[in-house]
């Protein structure tokens, strides 16, 4: 291994021991994956159908996602001018041929591809859809009419590859394995688990492709080409009619008038305050009787208030807590840091391996350590999902505890 860190790519079929049979399914790993791929295919059809129905339902309200063919003549001129002025100058097209290797495709990013010919030679053109431009182009007018950027780029590929003959066009997206796990040997030689996880996250970008999505069917030659490049099977290539990235929906929601939004969207659920607690201090109420809160039906605010009270309570000695996921803005971390800065002994077990929240948890762990908290990064062989907290305080000559378990508030005494 040396200074390099090994990552177990659990998807890589070449590393899979197919002699191992799972006791529940009775299948080896390859058989399980094949069954998963087969089960996913009909789900795509159901998803496409649902998306199409929702699109049609929104059209009468003036919310219309369109293709180039559906645009009016003036709108087509607007889109073409916008493409030439604003999009074409920032595109980074690539040619894949004998002299130019196939590029690394980023996880869940969109790429417009073209089958090209020049002087009788076939090649592939690839255009990454820029991440720093809007996912959709809004059309002039009062209604919310828009076209997705990948469709705009695909429409004008003949302008991008103007020295080539474009014989087919498509856009694709690959999903890479996200199951990153530090190698056992790397854990043994590296005592900084946080740094190890940061290095591990960088490896995620180059993990094996587990799925490829396409907007249009691939011909057999192109399908074989991508299967060879990504080391996947045809069963892992899925054609979909709905967008491969849905982030743009939040932009559309911001444009919908509030009056219309109320008729189209369910009212957000609001957790209810507990009938067993008053607006006064939480800790004295918990000392009198056990209180059970059920989240998300009841508000988490009493738990946060209790941690804040403990941070400033002179009788509190220690706060111990496990954390699996945190929001980008977390009051809980603020209160734990305040407790440490006020001289409490604060121990936080934060799980750095929370899928897709690893970097967020790493950032928060640094903030906690800076404030003086003792931070533990989980245990080898285990992933900590439990949410428990133990507050220790001195009551005259006794040591007592308040113990929210799964952040439902209980009380215990010693």
What are these regions (language model features)?
Residues 72-75, 134-135, 181-182, 218-222, ...:
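Flexible loop/turn segments at secondary-structure boundaries
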Residues 352, 356-410:
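Phosphate/diphosphate-binding loops
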Residues 2-9, 408-414:
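Conserved small/polar residues in nucleotide/adenosyl-binding loops
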Residues 87-90, 103-105, 312-371:
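Primarily the HKD phosphodiesterase
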Residues 87, 174, 319, 388, ...:
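A residue-level signal for conserved active-site and pocket-lining positions in enzyme catalytic cores
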Residues 234-317, 397-402, 406-411:
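Active-site cores of enzymes that catalyze phosphoryl transfer or operate on phosphate-rich substrates
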Residues 225, 305-306, 331-336:
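A short acidic, amphipathic alpha-helical/loop segment
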Residues 3-243, 264, 288-289, 295-298:
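Extended, highly charged clamp/arch subdomains and adjacent linkers
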